[in-house]
């Protein structure tokens, strides 16, 4: 069974809770869909955990926040710095050269069985498109399933859980999944799932998100996992990063 986790955002408490839940649920493989760092208070701890998973065979991708952290700092033209760059600057001071080397060698997409995994959109992974509309989902799914052996694609980046299914009669349809309820998926159908965010949900529910997929039975389950998100928010405040990062975690938005 494949556990799919995305947008960890340096939130070690959320990651540990999701990994414990996945292991208890029978996960035997792991795919980490990028944005390991950014916003959260524990980038080094999260990277250490992910690197250990990678050493055991997990697939790990690079996201836009990972890319920004290892890029050259953005030059100031005034006193205003985008919040993403504020986060990247802070993160650079918290991680090691070994962490940076690990991030820079990560791919943007990978194939796991009949699944393509990608942080943003399969049609242009480096442009960081949000797969948050039927149109964007269609472009992503089309690009993914043009690859030999790919039937479905798993995506991160939007911090929400969604399921898109291509019907023979109605074309691509969108569903909002119910946590813990399995989707039994007919063979030969193409579909797309956005797996949500482990470390920074944005749908009004502060619980961590991830998904489990059993390729043998073609059953997909989206999960929400309780963890101490208020302690994680307090750690952000203590880190000296913008308070907005903490309040967003507190509200799940």
Task: Briefly describe each language-model feature range.
Residues 9-14, 38-41, 65-70, 111, ...:
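Active-site environment of divalent metal-dependent phosphoester hydrolases
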Residues 56-59, 151-152, 221:
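Short active-site oxyanion
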Residues 26-29, 95-168:
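His/acidic metal-ligating clusters that form di-metal
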Residues 3-100:
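Core catalytic region of metal-dependent phosphoesterases/phosphodiesterases
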Residues 1-3, 110-117, 186-192:
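Beta-strand-turn-beta hairpins that frame and shape the catalytic cleft
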Residues 44-46, 133-139, 175-177:
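Charged helix-capping and loop-helix junction motifs
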Residues 168-253:
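Acidic, His/Gly-rich catalytic cores of divalent-metal-dependent hydrolytic chemistry
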Residues 71-75, 129-130, 165-168, 233-235:
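Short aromatic-enriched loop/helix-cap "lid" or pocket-rim segments at secondary-structure transitions
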């Amino acid at each position: 069974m494949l556990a799919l986790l995305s947008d960890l955002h340096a939130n070690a408490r959320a990651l540990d809770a999701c990994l414990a839940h996945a292991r208890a649920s029978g996960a035997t493989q792991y795919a980490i869909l990028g944005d390991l760092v950014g916003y959260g208070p524990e980038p080094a701890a999260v990277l250490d955990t992910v690197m250990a998973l990678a050493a055991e065979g997990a697939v790990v991708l690079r996201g836009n926040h990972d890319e920004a952290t290892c890029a050259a700092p953005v030059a100031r033209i005034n006193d205003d710095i985008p919040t993403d760059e504020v986060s990247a600057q802070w993160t650079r001071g918290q991680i090691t050269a070994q962490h940076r080397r690990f991030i820079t060698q990560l791919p943007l997409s990978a194939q796991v069985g009949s699944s393509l995994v990608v942080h943003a959109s399969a049609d242009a992974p480096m442009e960081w498109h949000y797969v948050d509309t039927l149109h964007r989902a269609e472009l992503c799914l089309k690009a993914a399933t043009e690859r030999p052996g790919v039937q479905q694609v798993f995506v991160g980046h939007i911090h929400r859980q969604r399921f898109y299914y291509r019907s023979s009669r109605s074309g691509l349809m969108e569903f909002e999944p119910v946590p813990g309820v399995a989707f039994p998926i007919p063979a030969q159908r193409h579909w797309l799932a956005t797996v949500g965010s482990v470390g920074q949900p944005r749908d009004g529910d502060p619980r961590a998100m991830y998904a489990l997929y059993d390729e043998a039975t073609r059953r997909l389950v989206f999960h929400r996992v309780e963890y101490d998100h208020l302690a994680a928010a307090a750690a952000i405040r203590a880190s000296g990063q913008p308070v907005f990062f903490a309040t967003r975690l507190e509200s799940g938005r």
